[in-house]
Design a protein with these regions (language model features):
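Macrodomain-like recognition of ADP-ribose-binding/processing modules
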Residues: 1-188
């Protein structure tokens, strides 16, 4: 493409070789800038990513979990399945996914939902008021939602997250639980 670059005279007071070199650098910069802008737009506007493997397909979508349809939605609760939404440290934050879910779908009797699936409490009690707690990853179906015991509670009722090993154990339990309850539907997890 010497001919293409030779047609452009960017500076009239320099040799043709310098003009060709400047035209090449300018073309490179233009292509680079357009590539960066195109990639930035793609990353900004993409809404989903699909990961496929042997015997599974995971689709990661960006959006409001509570607005998803035709799927089972996993809503994470604390280890005691607290249903009180409010501002106290032991309450569910109204801005969290769990808080938004509970405000749209109040649960009057969580214990009956737990009893209906014969979910056994964990061997130890919660650090928060010695309440019954459930292993992280265990699910309780409620309509199109699967309510998951997740965050452990400290003595003040605040949720905290566990070590890498405990997190992996939680995921292992979760996958087994999903296998029981998903009913051949897609599953959306926050």
């Amino acid at each position: 493409p010497e001919i293409v670059f030779g047609k452009f005279k960017l500076l009239s007071n320099v040799s043709d070789e310098v003009n060709v070199m400047l035209a090449r650098v300018l073309a490179f910069v233009v292509v680079l800038v357009l590539s960066v802008i195109g990639n930035a737009l793609y990353l900004h506007y993409r809404r989903k990513v699909r990961i496929k493997g042997h015997n599974y397909s995971i689709q990661i979508e960006y959006g409001d979990l509570l607005e998803m349809h035709a799927c089972k939605k996993v809503i994470d609760f604390d280890e005691c399945f607290t249903t009180t939404v409010g501002g106290a440290p032991s309450d569910i934050n109204p801005d969290s996914i769990c808080g938004q879910y509970l405000e749209k779908n109040p649960i009057q009797d969580m214990q009956s939902l737990i009893d209906n699936v014969h979910l056994k409490p964990a061997k130890s009690k919660s650090k928060f008021q010695g309440k019954e707690r459930y292993d992280s990853g265990k699910l309780v179906p409620n309509g199109e939602c699967l309510l998951m015991a997740f965050a452990k509670l400290d003595k003040d009722g605040r949720g905290w997250f566990f070590s890498r090993e405990e997190f992996l154990d939680c995921l292992s339990i979760l996958w087994n639980e999903i296998d029981k309850y998903y009913g051949q539907k897609d599953v959306c997890i926050s």
